[in-house]
Each structure stands twice: as structure tokens, then as C-alpha cells.
From Swiss-Prot:
An MF annotation (GO) of this entry: toxin activity
Name of the molecule in the record: Conotoxin Vi6.2
Cysteine-cysteine disulfides: C49-C62, C56-C67, C61-C77
Function according to Swiss-Prot or TrEMBL: Ion channel inhibitor that inhibits the increase in intracellular calcium upon depolarization in DRG neurons. In vivo, both intraperitoneal and intracranial injections into mice induce hyperactivity.
UniProt-listed InterPro entries: Conotoxin
Pfam families, sorted: Conotoxin
Length: 80
């Protein structure tokens, strides 16, 4: 009888801990996606202007920089 009670208690405890862990990991995945989205927004390639030394054939240069050497291959952003 004691062994049966111990087994039932153990099974209930393990089931409850799995349910709690599954709930927790689902929430973590959601927040991880938000964090990754924010990191992608701040990614170097996601900017709308070229920084010093970067090409200016796709995006215009950032404020304070000028596109120099704009031949067929495009120019490079340099200080004014």
C-alpha cells in the first residue's frame, strides 16, 4: 500500500513538473522571437544609409558623408 501511494505521488509530481516546464518553455520561445526581431532591426545590414567606408550604390550615405568615386561599381561613403 505504501509503495502504491509513493508511486502515485511520484507520477503526479512528474506530470505536474512536465506541464509547468512545457508552459515555461513556450513563453521563453515567444520572448526569444521578439528578441531576435529586435536584433535584426539593429543589424548592420538593416540600416537605411551607408556608413563610412561602405558602398553607396544601394543605400545613400548617412548624414555627414558623401558618396565618392561613383563609377560603374558604385562609390564609397566618405566624410565631407
Amino acid at each position: 500500500m505504501k509503495l502504491t501511494c509513493v508511486l502515485i505521488t511520484t507520477v503526479l509530481f512528474l506530470t505536474a513538473s512536465q506541464l509547468i516546464t512545457a508552459d515555461y518553455s513556450r513563453d521563453k520561445r515567444q520572448y526569444r522571437a521578439v528578441r531576435l526581431r529586435d536584433e535584426m532591426r539593429n543589424f548592420k545590414g538593416a540600416r537605411d544609409c551607408g556608413e563610412q567606408g561602405q558602398g553607396c550604390y544601394i543605400y545613400p550615405c548617412c548624414p555627414g558623408l558623401t558618396c565618392l568615386g561613383g563609377g560603374t561599381g558604385g562609390g564609397v561613403c566618405q566624410p565631407q
